[in-house]
Amino acid sequence: KHWKDWLKENGKDIGYVFLNRPHISVKYIDAVREFTNARVIYYGHDLHFLREKREYELTGDAALLQSSADWEKKELELILAADMAYYPSYVEEQAIHEIAPQAKVKAIPAYLFSDVEECEYHFDKRKDLMFIGGFGHRPNVDAVKWLANEIMPALVKKLPDIRVYILGSNPPEEVEQLATENLLIKGFVTDEELQEYYQNCRISIVPLRYGAGIKGKVIEAMRFGTPVMTTSVGAEGIKGAESILDIADEAADFVEQLAALYQNEAELVRRSKASYQYIRDNFSFENAKKVIGPEFDLE
């Protein structure tokens, strides 16, 4: 309630301020600049304007185009007001520099893993597919609807016994009613249960048609050595994704590649090992320290 008074009184002793997400940061950045001499770091997580623009391109909803323009103005103001802006991948960095070349922005590792224990991929002990995503996020709802309506009918013809587990909190009625004997809507699962799904399913599927930024569900699957089938949106921000992930944007191509991968033991084992290696190479504490060192005087 009285945070501004506190900041005014103590601001001289604050060396760094780390702000997260545009709708939160916009409330504080002016006061931080007014009452402190702190180095301000802004972490945007993803580009809201880019995500909403892509949703507009998919749906044609004019309100999304206006919302995208509003977000772009707000996000750019925050980026330019900060001493440095962080984003989870090179994709956001490039997108920002295209519209604001003067912006100070860099990609940082979105996730950090101190110890990646590699488990052997046992093809014969794994079966079925999984999707994980919170349903308060519109792209996840769209992904499951596209999966159910455009992918599952053809996939079941190729793999009649296949099951796809839909995991994630608060599935709306429009998702619940998509359930079939092959598409199981499980809803919320604990971290322990989620890890069991990663260890028992052959493939994690991420059929996102829009969104922005590096996708946590993709990195998480790779962290557990579970091969991923996704779209170019799902693979966004992962350098060299084609050698680690299977990627298709059209439903027919998605089905063909997914069915082939599901039955290819050697390729699944290779992708599992490649996933572990990618995580070790790109999401270590040592790597993060090198990237953020200049801003926090860690060098």
Feature annotation, model-predicted:
Residues 7-27, 41:
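Short N-terminal targeting/anchoring amphipathic segment
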Residues 14-15, 83, 199-213, 224-226:
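Acidic donor-binding loop of glycosyltransferase active sites
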Residues 35-52:
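Active-site proximal beta-strand in glycosyltransferases
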Residues 48, 63-85:
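Membrane-proximal helix-turn-helix segments that form the acceptor-binding/catalytic region
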Residues 80-86, 98-102, 106-200:
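Conserved catalytic-core segment of nucleotide-activated headgroup transferases in glycan assembly
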Residues 217-221, 227-231:
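Short hydrophobic beta-strand element within catalytic cores of glycosyltransferases
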Residues 244-252, 260-265:
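Conserved acidic donor-binding segment of nucleotide-sugar-dependent glycosyltransferases
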Residues 263-296:
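A charged, aromatic-enriched C-terminal amphipathic alpha-helix characteristic of glycosyltransferases
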